[in-house]
C-alpha cells in the first residue's frame, strides 16, 4: 500500500509498505543515486532519522533487524547504510546490525546512530558498557574534530546534541581501527570513525530538534562515495579552527542557552 506523508508541508514523500515488512520512503528530492538501507533496531526514533535522510534527498528502505538477510540487502545494491538507534545492548539486541557492518564495511558508507555507534564499536572488537550517567532526552555540549560527519563545522565552538542512552563505547577499549571524533566534558565518547572505511557513528541523536547541525551532518554522509576514505580524500582534511563561522552572535548564544533551559525544565 502507498501512503502520502502526514506532513506534506515539510515532506511530500511516498511510503510503500511491502509484504516482507520492508518500508520504502522515496524522497521528492531524490538524487537518483540509489537506495539508502536503514536497519531498524526496533526504535521509536527510526522514522525521525528516516525523515531527515529523505529531506536531504535519500531514498530509504527500512528493514527490522531480524526480518532481513545479508543476501536480500545485497540484492538491493544500496549506496549506503544507516544503523538506527535502539534499546538494549548491541551484542544481544541488534539483530543483523553487526553482520551488516562487518559485511558492508569497506564497500559502502555506513552511519551509526546511538545504538548504531555501539554496534560499530563491538563489530570491530570494542567494549560497550555503562556510561556512568543516564540520559533520556537531555542535551549536552560536545567537542568534535571538524571532519567526516562534522565537516564544515567549526571546532572552536561546541555543538549541542540530544542524548538517549545509558551505555557507551569504553574509550580505553576502542579498537585501533577506530578513532574518537567527538566527546562530552565527562569523557563519554560521542563519535567514532573507522580509520580506513567510510564508517562513522555518533552516540547522540542528530535528528532531534534539540540537536544542532543534523541536516549538515546527514548531507555530509550522503555525499560520500565508495567504502573507503581514500575514495573521499577531501572528507578528512584538517579543518580550520578559525574563520567567520567560529564566532557566535549574541542571538545564537541566547538561543543555545534557551534550548538548554528548556531541556533541563523537562527533566
Each model region followed by its residue ranges:
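Active-site-proximal beta-strand elements of phosphoester/diester hydrolases
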Residues: 200-204
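Short hydrophobic/Thr-rich beta-strand motif most characteristic of the beta2 strand and flanking loop
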Residues: 59-65
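Cysteine-nucleophile active-site neighborhood
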Residues: 33-35, 75-160, 218-220
Amino acid at each position: 500500500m502507498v501512503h502520502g506523508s502526514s506532513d506534506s508541508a515539510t515532506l511530500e514523500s511516498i511510503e510503500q509498505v511491502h509484504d516482507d515488512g520492508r518500508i520504502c520512503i522515496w524522497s521528492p528530492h531524490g538524487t537518483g543515486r540509489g537506495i539508502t538501507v536503514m536497519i531498524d533496531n526496533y526504535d521509536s526514533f527510526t522514522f525521525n532519522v528516516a525523515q531527515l535522510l529523505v529531506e536531504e534527498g535519500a531514498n530509504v528502505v527500512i528493514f527490522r533487524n531480524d526480518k532481513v538477510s545479508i543476501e536480500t540487502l545485497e540484492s538491493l545494491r544500496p549506496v549506503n547504510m544507516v544503523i538506527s538507534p535502539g534499546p538494549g545492548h548491541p551484542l544481544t539486541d541488534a539483530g543483523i546490525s553487526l553482520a551488516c557492518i562487518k559485511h558492508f564495511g569497506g564497500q559502502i558508507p555506513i552511519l551509526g546512530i546511538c545504538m548504531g555507534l555501539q554496534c560499530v564499536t563491538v563489530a570491530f572488537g570494542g567494549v560497550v558498557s555503562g556510561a556512568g550517567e543516564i540520559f533520556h532526552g537531555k542535551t549536552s555540549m560536545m567537542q568534535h574534530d571538524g571532519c567526516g560527519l562534522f565537516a564544515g563545522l567549526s571546532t572552536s565552538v561546541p555543538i549541542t546534541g540530544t542524548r538517549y542512552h545509558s551505555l557507551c563505547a569504553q574509550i580505553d577499549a576502542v579498537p585501533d581501527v577506530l578513532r574518537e571524533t567527538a566527546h562530552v566534558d565527562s569523557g563519554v565518547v560521542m563519535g567514532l570513525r573507522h580509520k580506513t572505511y567510510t564508517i562513522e557513528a555518533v552516540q547522540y541523536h542528530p535528528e532531534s530538534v534539540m540537536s544542532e547541525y543534523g541536516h549538515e551532518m546527514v548531507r555530509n554522509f550522503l555525499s560520500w562515495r565508495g567504502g573507503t576514505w581514500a575514495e573521499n580524500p577531501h572528507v578528512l582534511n584538517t579543518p580550520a579552527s578559525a574563520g567567520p563561522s567560529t564566532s557566535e552572535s549574541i542571538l545564537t548564544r541566547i538561543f543555545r542557552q534557551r534550548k538548554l533551559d528548556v531541556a533541563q525544565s523537562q527533566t
